[in-house]
């Protein structure tokens, strides 16, 4: 089972979540986490990068995978350095959009 970490509250409880029996990985939902961090400035709010390090560290201490959805392959090395070992790049819609733009951009003008 993969536990989604998408809020400041989930980041604060990442150690606890990672220790739950049956949880194999912590997976950051970056858009939701960033939105939550902006909406809740009064919480014991870490920066986005600090939150990512907390989640990756919690997963590592529990012997679990740490995952995240990235927008671009250029972000892979940076997130591996933070401790993420389950990396997804882009989304199905994003990949289809890029393919569509590549095809239509290569088509000759009428």
Positions of PLM-derived features:
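Expand to "…catalyze enediolate/carbanion chemistry for C-C bond making/breaking, isomerization
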Residues: 1-110
């Amino acid at each position: 089972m993969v536990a989604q970490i998408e809020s400041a509250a989930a980041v604060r409880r990442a150690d606890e979540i990672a220790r739950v029996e049956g949880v194999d990985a912590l997976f950051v939902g970056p858009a939701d986490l960033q939105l939550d961090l902006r909406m809740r400035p009064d919480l014991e709010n870490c920066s986005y990068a600090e939150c990512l390090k907390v989640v990756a560290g919690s997963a590592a201490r529990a012997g679990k995978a740490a995952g995240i959805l990235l927008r671009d392959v250029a972000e892979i090395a940076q997130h591996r350095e933070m401790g993420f070992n389950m990396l997804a790049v882009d989304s199905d819609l994003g990949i289809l959009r890029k393919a569509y733009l590549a095809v239509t951009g290569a088509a000759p003008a009428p």
